[in-house]
Amino acid sequence: MKKYIFLLIILAATIFTSFTDCKKDEVNNIENEHEIPIDIEKPDVVIKPIQMWIDAHANLSRFSQKSSITSYLKKMKETGFNEVYVDVKPGIGYALYDSDILPPLTKWGDETVERDWDYLAYWIEEAERLDMKVIASLSVLGYGYTKTKEGLVYEDDRWNGKTQKEMPDSSRPDLVVDMRDQTNVDAVMLNPAIPEVQIFILSIIEEIATKYPQLKGICLDYCRWYGGRYGFGNATISAFEAYSGVTVNNNNQIITRIGGIGPLYKHWIEFRSMTITNFITNIRSKVKAINPDLELHLWASADWRSRYIVGQNWASKKYKPTGSSSIYTDSYNKTGFADQIDVFSLGAYTDKIWIKEDPNSVWTVENFVTTYSDFTRGDCDVHGSFASYAYGNDQEKISDAVYLCLKNTDGLMVFDISHVINHNQWDAIGDGINRVYKK
């Protein structure tokens, strides 16, 4: 009997011990579930597009050799850039790519550069090797250089009557001056209200998009009227009459003899903006038909309230301006083109960085990069851009401008590499980038 009792005690002890061990394992497993792992996998930081602009005129000789392109692309990469805008059809109207439509750009003023290689193709090739992207930029409507009378519009009678014309003195409304005869403008610009002009430019964009499928995008620059008094030739007035249904008997119906706002002014403003927007829409259709993944970019001044003068309503169609009923029609919002571009390069080109420097003005980098969404309403990506020449050797300002643009928008563009080189701004740009990514 005692033997059986002893065996029962041993069995009970074994069961209890096993039960206790199971409970300990269960507790340990629960505790292990809540242990903090030693190696935490951090989420990937999304690096925004950080772009350098390569102006054709300022860098014509600098990039006459392949070795220079390679060297500076490496410098850009080391600084933090991952994309580059390459100006391939500047305002003189010649090509820096392999074109069957435009003459090659070999001479500009006193500079002469001969190449037996494809300029744009080499930028793309070297950028790809460094895991960088290229966007081809072009002066959309610029086709002549007034200071030396060089360019397409000076060589071909085809463009007679198709350039923009200025009414310089509203007290003499019948006097209009062809841009080709002026010397104080950046470029002679073709008239976007003329169908032949649009067809010609579309063919150039089609050529670039077709020949260079490796491009990330195409950027439109100078896609506008040159200024508020440009566009008063017969061709534009006729197009305005057809658009608005009004008859213009005198240009002073648009701008008065003393330079004020005439009774047709706001209708004129809508027409000019709609002309540009329809043109951009046509460009988008052409680009996307060739390559749906090819991005359409556009650069314009960040000061939206002054852009009506040149027909650039870069806002969303959802944005309706308030006030200024003498400037904007009730339907002006339909001229917004933010939904027709993929990327808007927001030109915050001003010497003031912080709002506190000039609190009563919109003209600060900080203001522009923190208020743009009021206008674009999310219709496109926006990259803050600044003019590096405005800050010279002031390293702090350069770093601040980079920081504000990159921190507050979808990307950054620095204009332009010639000023970055001349003022040795590389370290300051790198510092601004690192402030955003806290390296």
Regions inferred by a protein language model and the residue ranges of each:
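Aromatic-lined carbohydrate-binding/catalytic grooves of carbohydrate-active enzymes
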Residues: T79-R115
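Bacterial Sec-dependent N-terminal signal peptides
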Residues: T14-V45
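Aromatic- and acidic-residue-enriched segments that line the glycan-binding/catalytic groove
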Residues: L96-W108, G142-Q182, L220-R257, I309-K320
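Catalytic domains of carbohydrate-active enzymes, especially glycoside hydrolases
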Residues: S67-Y94, P213-K216, K334-L346, N408-L412
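Active-site-adjacent "subsite" loops/lids of carbohydrate-active enzymes
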Residues: K42-F63, A136, L141-T210, I258-Y265
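Substrate-binding cleft of secreted/luminal carbohydrate-active enzymes
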Residues: I327-K439
